[in-house]
Regions:
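Intrinsically disordered, low-complexity polar regions and short flexible loop motifs
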Residues: 1-205
Length: 205
């Protein structure tokens, strides 16, 4: 049985061109082993408190590429993303808030983690704008939407110059999703959209 104060975190490697990494908390507690770009860990139960996070290249614990202190409140559900381009790596926290969800609906939001992309709009093929003028490191509010299969395009705000086309996004009922834009508009790895199920869909705190 979990402590009533338990929090839950997952890690996301969203730093373009960075190698696979190992992530440690408070010295020797490993949170992620050989986490590659674009990958998430499962949600991990952790106690609230202050943590020192060290990120190393996978299988090389000589010198961390990032050391950061992280304060985690109790009963939090969150994704902790490694973002930015080396050597300006940083940790970015995306909390999964508990909020009402009407039966047989889904909720989606957009998280802009592409370091060289301008502010963007997320658009449906019919021209309907789901999210508008979202800048790097912005997290939108959740939007209620009918469960279905969707196609979206991402374009610099105010233009129809699509930089990413994503078909066949299947949204199930009674669930929360985040659309994470990662990668680079100019260069490799190119811009892509990660669409995980958020922990607030099924984790009780």
């Amino acid at each position: 049985m979990r402590d009533k104060k338990t929090s839950y975190i997952r890690l996301l490697h969203a730093s373009p061109k960075a190698p696979a990494v190992d992530v440690y908390a408070n010295g020797d507690n490993i949170l992620a082993d050989d986490l590659s770009y674009g990958e998430f860990t499962p949600y991990l139960p952790v106690m609230p408190g202050t943590y020192t996070i060290d990120i190393y290249p996978a299988d090389n614990s000589d010198t961390p590429i990032l050391t950061k202190e992280l304060v985690l409140p109790e009963k939090t559900i969150a994704t902790i993303a490694a973002i930015g381009e080396l050597p300006e790596l940083e940790l970015f926290i995306v909390e999964d808030p508990k909020e009402p969800l009407q039966p047989n609906t889904s909720k989606i939001r957009f998280v802009h983690l592409s370091p060289d992309a301008p502010a963007v709009d997320v658009i449906e093929p019919n021209g309907s704008i789901l999210f508008k003028d979202v800048s790097y490191k912005d997290i939108t509010d959740y939007l209620s939407i009918t469960p279905d299969t969707y196609t979206v395009e991402i374009a610099p705000t105010g233009t129809d110059n699509s930089v990413l086309f994503v078909p066949n996004i299947r949204l199930l009922p009674d669930a929360f999703y985040s659309l994470y834009a990662i990668g680079l508009v100019e260069g490799d790895p190119y811009l892509q959209l990660l669409i995980p199920l958020d922990g607030n869909s099924y984790i009780e705190t």
